[in-house]
Amino acid sequence: MRFNQVVLSGSLPNNITTLTFGECFNQVVPPGTLPNSLTTLTFGGYFNQVVLPGSLPNSLTTLTFGYDFNQVILPGSLPNSLTTLRFGRDFNQEVLPGSLPNSLTTLTFGDDFNQVVPPGTLPNNLTTLTFGYYFNQIVPPGSLPNNLTTLTFGNDFNQVFLPGTLPNSLTTLTLGDDFNQVVPPGTLPNSLTTLTFGRYFNQVVLPGSLPNSLTTLTFGYDFNQVILPGSLPNSLTTLTFGHCFNQVVLSGSLPNNLTTLTFGQCFNQVVLPGTLPNSLTTLTF
């Protein structure tokens, strides 16, 4: 797709709802060019222009930038109707206070984003937040909004979570491959139901560190620590160990509500009678 022409005012029909620019498009979009019917806008790979205040219509709900986009988002440039915002690979700009509209519920940063996100930057209505491959900044307490339910970190993230960092609304937390920090008791919120560790996580799970709300726990490739009795919450129903796990399963270490248990390829231990809970319905060695 070679289209790379200025879009003239009035050239787009008033009923258009979805607009996708191809890879080559890299023109400033003047205010008043895009119709007020537009709900979904996608820029291609080469687009890297400042988004001028007033250039995006108040009807817009979904905005996706391509991999070259790396411009500061000015306060007032994104419409208050926007609910989903996706940045591409190259975006690595400071997120200015007031630049993200309060209507936003889903925010995805691309691989290169590696900026501190200060408290008050992310809108309160945000429910889903995804950081990309290279993000590795401390997340200050109070910087994640209180309505956040799903949080995903990329490959490079390896920071300690300070107390009060993760909001009590959080239900799903996914940590990237490089994360390998002890998770102290009180760090994870009691709302959390799904926790996924990445490839290199290999720390002892301390009793009381996993909340009683947790139902699904997945360990990554390298995890190979003894599971101490009382360290896994009774709410847990699904437990998955990764490739390297090869520890004796201690009596009383698996919760009584567990229904699905998966061991990795390296597991080769005798399982003593009474070790596996009677609630178990699916077992994979």
What does each of the following model-derived ranges do?
Residues M1-R2, T284-F285:
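A detector of long low-complexity, disordered segments enriched in serine/threonine/proline
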Residues R2-S11, C24-P31, Y46-S55, D68-S77, ...:
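Leucine-rich repeat
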